[in-house]
Swiss-Prot record:
Organism of origin: Trillium maculatum (Spotted wakerobin)
Subcellular location: Plastid, Chloroplast
Family designation: Belongs to the intron maturase 2 family. MatK subfamily.
Designated name of the protein: Maturase K
Family matches, as Pfam families: Intron_maturas2, MatK_N
GO biological process: mRNA processing; RNA splicing; tRNA processing
GO molecular function: RNA binding
The protein's role, per its UniProt record: Usually encoded in the trnK tRNA gene intron. Probably assists in splicing its own and other chloroplast group II introns.
InterPro entries membership: Domain_X, Maturase_MatK, Maturase_MatK_N
Main location: plastid
GO cellular component labels: chloroplast
Taxonomic path: Eukaryota, Viridiplantae, Streptophyta, Embryophyta, Tracheophyta
Signal peptide: none
Amino acid sequence: MEELQGYLEKDGSRQQNFLYPLIFQEYIYTLAHDHGLNSSIFYEPMEIVGLGYDNKSSSVLVKRLITRMYQQNSLIYSMNDFNQNRFVGHNNSFYSNLDSQMVSEGFAVIVEIPFSLRLVPSSEEIPKSQNLRSIHSIFPFLEDKLSHLNYVLDILIPYPIHLEILVQILQCWIQDVPSLHFLRLFLHEFHNWNNLITPTKSISVFSKENKRLFRILYNSYVSEYEFVFVFLRKQSYYLRSTSSRAFLERTHFYVKIEHLIDIDVCHNHFQKILWFFKDSFMHYVRYKGKAILASRGTYLLIKKWKCYLVNFWQYNFHFWSKPYRIHINPFSNYSFYFLGYISSVLINPSAVKNQMLENFYLVDTLTQKFDTIVPVIPLIGSLSKAKFCTILGHPISKPIWAELSDSDIIDRFGRICRNLSHYHSGSSKKQSLYRIKYILRLSCARTLARKHKSTVRNLLQRLGSGLLEEFFTEEEQVISPIFPKTTLFPLHGSHKERIWYLDIIRINDLANYLDWS
């Protein structure tokens, strides 16, 4: 990283024009496999799957890759032979997949440079905004705002069908023409777009082999559409008073009317758009491929927003967005899945006793409350896919972990359980979370029994029931001085208050699977 920073400081005025030579630098591919870089704010840790190649960068393979990239004849040969799908003419599929993955990861590091240069100064200017990165910081905002709104647009963000759209969007950030040509060649020549993106999923599911590169391309696309969307929203908010002629005060009335007429003449078409979407109670939240657009307005207004979004993606990004990907629902009888929670607005009826002189009477009132619960069935499906239980929720052993030591097995299961408790601490109903913990606990016991070639009962009798005490470290044990326990049972003891932690910067892996499924 220091070498990369030295390169940028050496020629800082032209840093974006000299990104392409970095592709031939060996340290770039070392950075791509560096754990510190992979755990940055941009991406999750990467791994090479299905190739028999570990996460450590091999200098020999990198040097061979750079040598082959220098050979222009083999590059031209590869362009003329699409059916072989071999990087720079290599005939071995192992090296083909491995080379393409190394190139995609290395190029992703290079593409990050313009973005990181924009983000680093802002993080230094606002050091107190660290907690705003927390995923849980979104939910207090939703609790405060959504309970007063009427309708919500549940949006599955569409993805561009053609690769050229992503390359053109990236041109706004990178002016290095050779790098863009190299990216275009890599996308069109060495991969089949239908294999990289699965149309049946809710959003574009990037292959694990090239996750890093394609995620930054997808984020560039999302940033582009949100820039235009937020601009329109801000303009409609700040200029909404220009359409309220009937409510002008009488002081200098005719002068104000003339001023408004001048505005209408200059910006007639744009103001029609602003009036079309006038709504001062509009809130937008997005995470990954899902977004919600909530409004306090009428059904007609929220329907206009839906039509606008469909036309916006069609005319600005030149691809058709299917209307059924955007759902209009009233908050009163609708639940939506977001960030690992099933969220809804509950209506709680209550009666208030009032007294006027000597007469007593009851007044029925309705209060709205934002509610979040743990999705049990999807989480069980996620555990089933991870081989912790069956599809019906019956715990099974984890054979791949049976070769580890007892402490490692308990530590792995315990870490998963504690992370789930930590992430889903904002649930209003903890009973669902207890079922997930029970599955993990019994799966851990069966894995230990499988290792020792025994039964779960004999294992617990021989080692003692306290073997898994550390496995179920409850969240309330940490915050018990603040929130007293509501029950004496250690397995089911939990506070009823919802708690949002500001140290969670990424979604839990089990809940993360739900977001992409």
